[in-house]
Design a protein with these regions (language model features):
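Helix N-cap / loop-to-helix initiation motif
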Residues: 83-84, 116-120, 155, 167
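Acidic/charged, solvent-exposed loop-and-adjacent secondary-structure segments enriched in E/D, K/R, S/T
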Residues: 145
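Histidine/lysine/aspartate-rich catalytic loop segments that bind and position anionic ligands
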Residues: 109-135
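A short structural micro-motif
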Residues: 35, 77, 97-98, 128-132, ...
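N-terminal hydrophobic signal/anchor transmembrane helix of membrane proteins
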Residues: 67-72, 90-107, 172-189
């Protein structure tokens, strides 16, 4: 493993896929079967050349019991959410901007571009701003994600606007999504995990 590869783990050593426990190997295979093809399809790096997982996926391997349930929640959000993909990516980038989480912004800039969000809007979102070329619903999602992430509360006017835009079911889904990416950014920032390049 090169010095550059070692840095991709931040404070945690990148786990060798040939030295995993049975429980870790189950999580590793699950990530490779789901996130691996997704990462490849939108052109961001989720593992090294020798198969070590990077980004949030490496710390996820360290605690397979809890991580299995976290991945279940992530999968359920993707499967059952009432939010469209553009709104989801606006929310995820807005959370990442508050956390200043380089890898999350790197990966989801690629996902946002695939969802049809303009490069200018992506740059603005990753800087913590509100792009002009979003829909009104997307702008409300950005404001909600940013306010909740920064202040841990939503004021009454913004809550009313969110319910008008998404319905109560949609606001619950919005809140679940924000929470999932608080955990993701927390893993990345706790272990000082950076992006593998300077895309964001």
């Amino acid at each position: 493993m090169t010095a550059h590869t070692e840095k991709l783990g931040g404070r945690l050593p990148l786990l060798d896929p040939l030295a995993l426990s049975a429980a870790q190997k189950e999580i590793y295979d699950r990530i490779n079967a789901t996130f691996g093809p997704w990462a490849a399809s939108i052109d961001f790096q989720a593992r090294t050349g020798d198969g070590r997982l990077i980004g949030p996926f490496n710390p996820i391997l360290y605690s397979p019991g809890i991580s299995s349930s976290f991945l279940d929640l992530h999968d359920a959000e993707e499967k059952y959410t009432s939010l469209d993909e553009r709104v989801r990516q606006v929310v995820i980038l807005s959370v990442g901007a508050v956390w200043k989480s380089d890898y999350e912004l790197y990966a989801h800039s690629a996902a946002a571009q695939r969802a049809g969000i303009s490069e200018n809007a992506i740059r603005t979102l990753t800087a913590g701003g509100l792009p002009d070329d979003l829909s009104e619903q997307e702008k409300i999602a950005q404001r909600y994600a940013r306010e909740f992430s920064a202040k841990h509360r939503i004021d009454a006017d913004l809550y009313s606007a969110a319910v008008h835009a998404f319905g109560e079911h949609g606001v619950v889904d919005l809140t679940y999504l924000i929470g999932i990416y608080h955990i993701t950014c927390g893993l990345l920032n706790s272990f000082d995990i950076s992006a593998p390049d300077q895309r964001v």
